[in-house]
From Swiss-Prot:
InterPro entries: aa-tRNA-synt_IIb, aa-tRNA-synth_II, aa-tRNA-synth_II/BPL/LPL, Ser-tRNA-ligase_type_1, Ser-tRNA-synth_1_N, SerRS_1_N_sf, SerRS_core, tRNA-bd_arm. One of its GO terms (cellular component) is cytoplasm. L-serine binds at T242, A243, E244, E296, S396. Pathway: Aminoacyl-tRNA biosynthesis; selenocysteinyl-tRNA(Sec) biosynthesis; L-seryl-tRNA(Sec) from L-serine and tRNA(Sec): step 1/1. GO terms for biological process: selenocysteine biosynthetic process; seryl-tRNA aminoacylation. Belongs to the class-II aminoacyl-tRNA synthetase family. Type-1 seryl-tRNA synthetase subfamily. Homodimer. The tRNA molecule binds across the dimer. This is Serine--tRNA ligase. CDD domains: SerRS_core. Pfam families: Seryl_tRNA_N (PF02403), tRNA-synt_2b (PF00587). ATP binds at R273, S274, E275, E360, I361, S362, S363. Its EC number is 6.1.1.11. It is found in: Cytoplasm.
Length: 435
C-alpha cells in the first residue's frame, strides 16, 4: 500500500500520478476524512490529558480532607472517561475508513512507465531471435499434442472441467524437464536459492502481496466465501495464484540485516487461478488454465538497488528463452496495463507460430515498497537503529505451460514430431524428438 503520508502531505500530487494509470482518487473524501481524523485525534489527546490532570486532583482533594470535592471530581473524571472512550471509537472508525480507501489504491507508476490505457499502448523495448518460416501448414500445440496422445484435454474435462490438462509420456516428461532446466539455471548460474513452499496460504499472506482485499474473486478458496467475494474469512486458506505469494511473504514481519541483501529466491509450484475476468478468452489449449506450473523469481533489495535488480531479474527470465532458442520480444507495460502493486513491469512475449503473434510468457515487476509496507518487511542499515522498508520484485522465470506451447509450435516438423531444444535433451534422457 502507499505511504499514508502521501495522502496527507502530497494528496494532489499523488492523485495526479494515479490519474496516469486511470485511477480516480477521491481527493475530497480523503481530505474530509483526514480533517475529521486530525480534529478527533486532537480532541482525544486533549481529553486524555484533562482526565489525567483531573485524576491527580482527586488525590489532592482527599489529602485536604475535602471528600465532597473528591467525589465531584471523581464523577467528572468518569464522564471524561466515557467521552474519551467514545472519541476513541469514532477515531478508530475514521482510521478504518481511511485504511479501507488506502487498501484500494494501486501503486504509483515510475516516471519511466509510458502513459496508456491498455495493452495496445505497451511499448516494445527489444526483440530477440527471428520467427521461423515453414514449408508446411503449421499446427497449433493442441493438434500436435493430441496427434500423439501426449496432451489429453478430454480426460481433464472429465476429471475436473475446462481449463485443465492431462499430459502423458514424453509430453509429461518434457513439462518436467522444462521446470528442472529453469530451476538449475536460476540456482546454478543466476544465484537464486531454491525454495519449496506451501501451496495453501492464509489471509495475511494474500493481503501482504496485494491479492486481498481487492482480488478475492480471482482465487480458489478452501471454504465458502461470505456474500461479498472480497471479504475472505480470516481463517480461510487459499490456493496460491503464484509462488510470489508464499516466497515474498518469507520476509513478512522481519527485519533483515543490510549485509544479507539482496535476497534472491526461486520456486517451482503449481498456480491456481479462477480466471474470473477471462470468460471466452483463450479457451483452446494451454495458454490460460485454472492450474498451471511456473518457476517464480523473487528478489528483496534495498530501495536504491531495486531498479537495477529489475533489469537483472528480467534478464534472467530472458536467458531461459535464449537458451531454448525461442524468439521473443520485451515490452514495458503502460500505466493502464500495469498490475495493482507494480511501479514498473516488463513483459516477455514469446512467438506463437499458430497464432502468428507474440504472447506473454513472463511478467517482471518492481513493487517498490508497496508490498513491504503491507508486510512490514524491513531491513536495518549498518550503524542505524531505525529500520527501513525493503523493495520487493518478482517475475516468471518462466511459466512452464506456455513455454511448452512455444517449444511444441516453434520446433514442430512436417511429420508432426517436435525437436527437443539442445539444453533440454539431458533432462529428457537424450531424446531428441517427441511426437
Amino acid at each position: 500500500m502507499l505511504d499514508s503520508k502521501l495522502l496527507r502531505a502530497e494528496l494532489d500530487e499523488t492523485a495526479a500520478k494515479l490519474a496516469r494509470r486511470g485511477f480516480p482518487l477521491d481527493v475530497e473524501t480523503i481530505r474530509e476524512l483526514e480533517e475529521k481524523r486530525k480534529s478527533l485525534q486532537m480532541k482525544t489527546e486533549e481529553l486524555q490529558a484533562l482526565r489525567n490532570s483531573r485524576s491527580k486532583s482527586i488525590g489532592q482533594a482527599k489529602a485536604k480532607g475535602d471528600h465532597e470535592e473528591a467525589e465531584r471530581i471523581l464523577a467528572e473524571v468518569g464522564n471524561l472517561g466515557a467521552e474519551l472512550d467514545q472519541a476513541k471509537v469514532t477515531l478508530a472508525e475514521l482510521q478504518s475508513e481511511l485504511e479501507t480507501i488506502t487498501m484500494s489504491i494501486p501503486n504509483l507508476p515510475d516516471a519511466e512507465v509510458p502513459d496508456g490505457k491498455d495493452e495496445d499502448d505497451n511499448v516494445e523495448v527489444s526483440r530477440w531471435g527471428q520467427p521461423k518460416t515453414y514449408d508446411f501448414e503449421v499446427k497449433d500445440h493442441v493438434d500436435l499434442g493430441e496427434m500423439s496422445g501426449g496432451l489429453d484435454f478430454a480426460s481433464a474435462v472429465k476429471i475436473s472441467g475446462s481449463r485443465f490438462i492431462v499430459m502423458k509420456g514424453k509430453f509429461a516428461r518434457l513439462h518436467r524437464a522444462i521446470a528442472q532446466f529453469m530451476l538449475d539455471l536460476h540456482t546454478d548460474e543466476h544465484g537464486y536459492t531454491e525454495m519449496y513452499v506451501p501451496y495453501l496460504v492464509n489471509h495475511d499472506s494474500l493481503y501482504g502481496t496485494g491479492q486481498l482485499p481487492k482480488f478475492g474473486e480471482d482465487l480458489f478458496h478452501t471454504s465458502p466465501l461470505t456474500e461479498q467475494v472480497s471479504d475472505v474469512p480470516l481463517k480461510t486458506l487459499s490456493l496460491i495464484p503464484t509462488a510470489e505469494v508464499p516466497v515474498t511473504n518469507m520476509v513478512r514481519d522481519t527485519i533483515t540485516d543490510e549485509a544479507e541483501l539482496p535476497l534472491k529466491m526461486t520456486a517451482h509450484t503449481p498456480c491456481f487461478r479462477s480466471e474470473a475476468g477471462s470468460y471466452g478468452r483463450d479457451t483452446r489449449g494451454l495458454i490460460r488454465m485454472h492450474q498451471f506450473d511456473k518457476v517464480e523469481l523473487v528478489q528483496i533489495t534495498k530501495p536504491e538497488d531495486s531498479m537495477a535488480a529489475l533489469e537483472e531479474l528480467t534478464g534472467h527470465a530472458e536467458k531461459v528463452l535464449q537458451l531454448l532458442e525461442l524468439p521473443y520480444r520485451k515490452v514495458i507495460l503502460c500505466t493502464g496495463d500495469m498490475g495493482f502493486g507494480s511501479a514498473k513491469t516488463y513483459d516477455l512475449e514469446v512467438w506463437v507460430p499458430a497464432q502468428e503473434t507474440y504472447r506473454e510468457i513472463s511478467s517482471c515487476s518492481n513493487m517498490w515498497d508497496f508490498q513491504a509496507r503491507r508486510m512490514q518487511a524491513r531491513f536495518r542499515r549498518k550503524g542505524e537503529k531505525k529500520p527501513e522498508l525493503v523493495h520487493t520484485l518478482n517475475g516468471s522465470g518462466l511459466a512452464v505451460g506456455r513455454t511448452m506451447v512455444a517449444i511444441l509450435e516453434n520446433n514442430q516438423e512436417a511429420d508432426g514430431r517436435i525437436a527437443i531444444p539442445t539444453v533440454l535433451q539431458p533432462y529428457m534422457g537424450g531424446v531428441t524428438h517427441i511426437g
